[in-house]
Structures are given as structure tokens and as C-alpha cells.
């Protein structure tokens, strides 16, 4: 597959939904993680991302406008020892619980399926970074319906060996749509990762659709020292 420019990918899609990027910095020094949230409804847009321990959680920007917390309030990122979990829903907790019990990322997600938000049946996307011996490996997954059919759940898993300057990008929606928003199709997209954490963060945030973007989390993990750098950007301030 052709390696894509993440800036162009985002700028050319008004509504990819929620997205995960995992890869390795161009200088080979850092594991790179990004997670973004977009929204169309008042309930979806009424959110901010805040730090929680080594990870993050979402919370309502204006609690009075929170109509349904079930699919919008969750912990997208949690850390367990040398493993960082990133997902677009409460399956973060499922993966954390399974890994803590010595079970696998795949086994955890096989207990879950797409979100129950008919007619979209939004995919659940998940990633895992595992640090080891000055390097790392990573995985991505998507749990989706077959063309919006809730009786036909599908699950896909992808395993990667990191390459300098390369990441993989998966998002919930192929593009905007009505009455049903079409789910992401195919493999995670190979994308270039350029610059330091601030350059990377700016590249993502400035190219997400201005009306629909809600929050962005980025993290660079130094593979030699384990030092973590994190950036969080919220539209609501």
C-alpha cells in the first residue's frame, strides 16, 4: 500500500469519526500514539479529554448538556506496565482487564462488538503498544457490522513491526453520510509520521474538520529511557 500523508487524509475527509494512529517517529527514537474524537451531535461535541493517571478519559464540558453518557464518556487510553491501550470506547477497560489476567488483546476484543447506535453501528477501534528491549510492537483492531447489518458482526486484527517514520491509521467512519454513516473499510492506512510531538500534534489538529473536531491526544514514548511526552488539545475551553 502507498504511504499516505496524514495531513491530506484528514483534510480530505470531513468526518472520519474517531481515529487512532500508531507508529514510530522518523528519527526512530519514539513510539507514537494519537487518538482523536469528532462529533456531529450536541452530545458528542460536548466533551473534553483530560489526563487520568498515565492515561486519559473523556468528560462532559458542560454537564447540563450531557444527554447520554453511555457511548461518549470512557477512558480512551490506559497503561498497564509496558503496554499502552488506546480505543474509542469502554473496550479499553475490557482489554486492560484481560491483559492484567495474562490474556490476549484479541481474546479481550472477541468478547465485544460494534457500538449499539443504530443505524450506524459504529465500529469499535482499538490499538495496543507493547514496549520491549528498547523497541516495541503494535496491534490494531476493528469490530464492525457487515454493511450496517447488526446480525453480522465482523472482527479484524492487524499486527505490526515498527518502521521509522511510518504509522498506521484507522478510523471509525469511511466518510460522512446519511441516514447511515458508512464504516471504515479495508486495512489500517500506512501514513507518514514527521517531526517531533508538537509538529505531529499540529499536523493532526489543524487538518481535522473545524466544525466536527472535538479533542486530540498524542503521545511520544522514548524507547530508550521510557520518558513519556503527552499533548492534549480540546476545542472546548
Where are these regions (language model features)?
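Conserved short alpha-helical segments that host acidic/polar catalytic motifs at enzyme active sites
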Residues: 1-237
